[in-house]
Amino acid sequence: MKQRNVNRVALIGAGSVGSSYAFALLNQSITEELVIIDLNENKAMGDAMDLNHGKVFAPNPTKTWYGTYSDCKDADIVCICAGANQKPGETRLDLVEKNLRIFKGIVEEIMASGFDGIFLIATNPVDILTYATWKFSGLPKERIIGSGTILDTGRFRFLLGEYFDIAPANVHAYIIGEHGDTELPVWSHADIGGISITELIKRNPEYTMKDLDELFINVRDAAYQIIEKKGATFYGIAMGLARITKAILNNENSVLTVSTYLDGEYGTEDVYMGVPAVVNRNGIREIVELTLNEQERQQFKHSANVLKEILAPNFKEQ
């Protein structure tokens, strides 16, 4: 990997997610340089101008400009938010063919620049497109990261916090699997202050597993609800992307639920899925393999199989 004294993030795609991500980066002063690249040059230029005008209010100034793929050469992270959007009633997997075509061209342009950093993928279906980026780029698998279930996990912790009247930061619970309809909650490892969720239910009759099952459905279907109401989701995922970016650039070794390549972990292989992983300056340091109960293992296996069925016709063995 290329080592520079100045951190640079290249953003591909200045749509709602990309622009919100850029806004989050500047507000938290996560990177020293941000270059915005979009087919619509005027949109990228406008975003760069708008963000620069607010730099005086940020903790530290971030050099921000609109650029071209050649600017990816010196980037530490390229975050791809470009692609076709999910429409009302459309699943994330419905976007596969459209976005695979788009991604092949984007990744080839980025690699032609001499880029040798870390890819961060946000475009849906994120697990499929993260795998595609790995295949198209030829970079090591640990340097290709998808947003995975980081937002689902955030939604999960928020709703659990509301239910138990506890700050979400003190709720420890994960959503794993596909970022989509087959994702699953890991109830067997969910706790608040070291007390398991199942134990809390036993102690207090006002809490029920039926309520929590409904809570998970609200987590899983949150995107559909938001899309129906406002057309797209972008603030939450942008903040999740900013969190991953911070973990990488600061070499945090933080555990985040991101889409990463499985090579035997969780009983599956040759697929990118959302699982807890240690994230640092080199990308994915290691996967945190939770001990799942039998029901969770079966659900995870089903989620993996759904993704593999989508991948199979598009990435045949060479």
UniProtKB/Swiss-Prot annotation:
One GO location term (cellular component): cytoplasm
EC number per UniProt: 1.1.1.27
Family annotation (SUPFAM superfamilies): LDH C-terminal domain-like, NAD(P)-binding Rossmann-fold domains
Residues given in the record as NAD(+) binding sites: 17, 38, 43, 69, 83-84, 122-124, 147
Residue positions binding beta-D-fructose 1,6-bisphosphate: 157, 172
EC supergroup of this enzyme: oxidoreductase
UniProt entry keywords in alphabetical sequence: Allosteric enzyme, Cytoplasm, NAD, Oxidoreductase, Phosphoprotein
Biological pathway: Fermentation; pyruvate fermentation to lactate; (S)-lactate from pyruvate: step 1/1
Activity regulation annotation text: Allosterically activated by fructose 1,6-bisphosphate (FBP).
Localization per record: Cytoplasm
Location, primary (coarse class): cytoplasm
GO molecular function: L-lactate dehydrogenase activity
GO terms of biological process kind: glycolytic process; lactate metabolic process
Keyword Endoplasmic reticulum listed: no
Top-level taxonomic group: Bacteria
List of residues binding substrate: 86, 92, 124-127, 152-155, 233
Known catalytic reactions: (S)-lactate + NAD(+) = pyruvate + NADH + H(+)
Residue positions where Phosphotyrosine is found in the record: 224
Matching NCBIfam families: L-LDH-NAD, PRK00066.1, PRK06223.1
Family listed: Belongs to the LDH/MDH superfamily. LDH family.
Assembly behavior: Homotetramer.
Function: Catalyzes the conversion of lactate to pyruvate.
Protein name: L-lactate dehydrogenase 1
Source lineage: Bacteria, Bacillati, Bacillota, Bacilli, Bacillales
